[in-house]
Amino acid sequence: MVWTSAVVMASPHGSASRAGSNRRTDGLSVNLGQDNTLKHDTPTETAPSASPPRVAPAPIPPKGGPAATPGKDGALDNRGSHDSVPPVAVAIPGREEVNATASQKSVVAGANSQPTPGTQSSKAPASDVDGSSKHGSPEHPDAGSPEVNAEGVPVEEALQAIGDDDPLIHNLPDGVVGRRAPANPFNSSMYAKLRGKKKKHRPKVRDPKLNNNPLRGRLVVCISTTALLCWIYMWELIYNFTSFNGRCVSPVMYPDYKLQEAKQRQPYVIRYGYGGCEYNLGSLAYPRASFGTSAGDKGWPVDLVPNGSAGSAATSWDSPNARVLRHLGGLETNYIREYSETFRLFTSMYMHGGWLHILINLSCQIQILWIIEPDWGFLRTTLLFFLGGISGNLLSAVADPCSITVGSSGSMYALLGALIPYCVEYWKSIPRPGCILVFMIVVIIGILTGMAGFTDNYAHMGGALGGILWGFASITTVSACDKCTLGERMAMTPPFSWCVPKATQQKLLERAKARKAEAIRRRKLQAIQKKKAGGARGKAMYAVKMRLQEEGRPPCKMSFREWVIRGLCAAALFAYWLILFLYLLDPSLYKSYSPPGQLKFSGWLYCKCGTIVYQAPQTYGNLGRFWCFGSEKDAQYYLEP
């Protein structure tokens, strides 16, 4: 077992003083509070002077000196001369022991520490905690002299000079600032009342104007996309009402084709009102509705249009008529290929097919953007939403060209997929990782339930893949997952914590704290090298680096590992887009393969593509075009001569 710290003192009478049993007396004791920052426990006896004179290192004891004996708590006891000053052996959890003999704080702490009853303070040099001799240690060949850095300053003194709030260590603002996490109903005050407990209130940041809080006021993408999606859906409903379910937008009146005189059969422009539409639709013009079952119709009157009933369309209780989706830019592969309407890849991701559709997408989208956007920023989140939606629509257009698709589900699943690189990037500071796991389960359930209904699974899978690739292509660091405490944090998050005993949770918490302390110390050692920059040029470079660091983001190592991950994921995303665009727009490619269609629990849905060869009045303007049909009857009618 490795102790947090140990100050070793010896008694000439042979009784060892306790080290590390009560309050630690060294300057590197670690205590992680609610703010997850490293705190120093300094003894009350230490002089408050900022820079007291240094104490010379103790002489090396002779080889024939007395051997070290363990104390009651495992600390080692040395006996030696009263004229020497004891160096301090410091042990950080999860790391090998480091000798700090020249640090002023540690020396004064060891010199001024009061001995326990029945013992006297010893000034003999202490040996390492593992009992090995300092003089012959292969790791410390010359332990009599302190370990120094390139500037000649002892390493332990340099470590203590760097505060835990130094921007080189982290750039979070002062106070308890936690990362946003999915809403956990098990942590709500209402659920706490049901269980007969009080909800623990976390201390808030003393920043009433929220100037320094990196997790507030950065929801531009969340607010703007939500408002845009709602506005476009309102426009769909208005257009469905004013266009008579998408059947009439022209003011031209077409008289009955059975009239005797040719002049009476001539069309006329009705300049005011809906006279032209009312005449063309006859009794089928009413009732008018923006959505619901009343928005369905039987097509056009058969007394004016012989095959008018072929254009009938039914609607559900929360949806507008499907005709308006095609008019307003829904995703339909046939129009992209034959009429060069590639804009449908973009416009369809902002349209929705019903109230339930948009409410589900917005509820999930707002929750994830509330988590991701404050850390990823405006540009990175905007590109995530856009690239994810296009990625989903590309896969849908190529794999299922026989149906029309609308909705921001591709972008929403891109946000869900982006939670994976987000967790890798910020794992150490995510408040409730268990809820993130629940979100991942929602993705799987959503895809599986989509196989039973009229949902576009290709848009969901393509969006999730695009979100994962873009997240890793733009990731700042992957070092947060080094020695990540996944099991420990999951075990202490409800509802998983209900199944773990309190004693086990405490052990897991201590293990996580040990890893945290080691990580902070390692980053401090790296910060020593960064602080060497001096002069005007060095200060300017330091200022630029600080401006490039976004608040709330962990230190970006910019190492070879990060660049490899970014490059591979960016190349994969580019190849994904390139292949799908070629199969969507290149006739030599999309005419040579058969699309699979949607996969459901009942099997693959019918989808067949080919060139229209049937000559009839109904095929005017379509003869010779390459078209995809979702109906076997229509495919046989138009694709066979």
From Swiss-Prot:
Ranges of biased composition (kind: Polar residues): 102-124
Record-annotated membrane-spanning stretches: 219-239, 352-372, 382-402, 404-424, 445-465, 567-587
Pfam families: Rhomboid
GO biological process, one term: proteolysis
Top-level lineage group: Eukaryota
GO molecular function, one term: serine-type endopeptidase activity
Keyword check for RNA-binding: no
Function: Putative serine protease involved in intramembrane proteolysis and the subsequent release of polypeptides from their membrane anchors.
Entry protein name: Rhomboid-like protease 4
